[in-house]
């Protein structure tokens, strides 16, 4: 990975599982077990130390994901890793399908209405379960359902622009 390459935060270590060095993970991928598909991982401890890991294996275990890191075989080592963040290089993710987007790619894009009224820039997104919502910050904060083509008319990465059919007063 190039030092300047964009990193994507996929999850974090939330605890130890058992006594053999297995770890409990929190994953923000969809589905959550997809975190194991994207490697190598760049792990960053709460103190800022970073290392690169390949060959991480894992499984679903009830409410948790359980991971096995190469060369970690004891609980004490795992407990010291609590809060460690898990990243991958953006290039490790496969291209999205047509009309699907990685949230991280949308963050920072400018948003304007079909009438050309500038609303601001994408701050972040969140899921409601039924659809995703894009949070746009400009003169004020707006939450717009990320629903194609009903509200989101186009996403143009070259123009750094999302066009929406949205009342600017709402």
Curated annotation (Swiss-Prot):
Gene Ontology terms: biological process: ribosomal small subunit biogenesis; rRNA processing
Domain remark text: The PRC barrel domain binds ribosomal protein uS19.
Name of this protein: Ribosome maturation factor RimM
Organism of provenance: Xanthomonas campestris pv. campestris (strain B100)
Annotated localization: Cytoplasm
Family: Belongs to the RimM family.
Role: An accessory protein needed during the final step in the assembly of 30S ribosomal subunit, possibly for assembly of the head region. Essential for efficient processing of 16S rRNA. May be needed both before and after RbfA during the maturation of 16S rRNA. It has affinity for free ribosomal 30S subunits but not for 70S ribosomes.
Keywords: Chaperone, Cytoplasm, Ribosome biogenesis, rRNA processing
């Amino acid at each position: 990975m190039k030092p300047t390459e964009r990193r994507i935060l996929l999850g974090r270590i939330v605890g130890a599982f058992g006594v053999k060095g297995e770890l409990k993970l929190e994953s923000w991928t969809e589905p959550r077990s997809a975190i194991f598909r994207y490697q190598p991982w760049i792990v960053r401890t709460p103190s800022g130390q970073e290392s690169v890991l390949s060959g991480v294996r894992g499984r679903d275990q009830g409410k948790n994901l359980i991971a096995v890191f190469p060369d970690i075989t004891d609980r004490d080592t795992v407990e010291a890793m609590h809060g460690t963040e898990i990243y991958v290089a953006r290039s490790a993710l496969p291209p999205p399908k047509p009309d699907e987007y990685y949230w991280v790619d949308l963050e920072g894009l400018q948003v304007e209405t079909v009438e050309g009224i500038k609303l601001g820039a994408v701050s972040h997104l969140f899921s409601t379960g039924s659809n995703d919502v894009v949070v746009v910050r400009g003169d004020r904060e707006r939450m717009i359902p990320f629903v194609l083509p009903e509200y989101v008319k186009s996403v143009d990465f070259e123009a750094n622009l999302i066009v929406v059919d949205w009342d600017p007063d709402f």
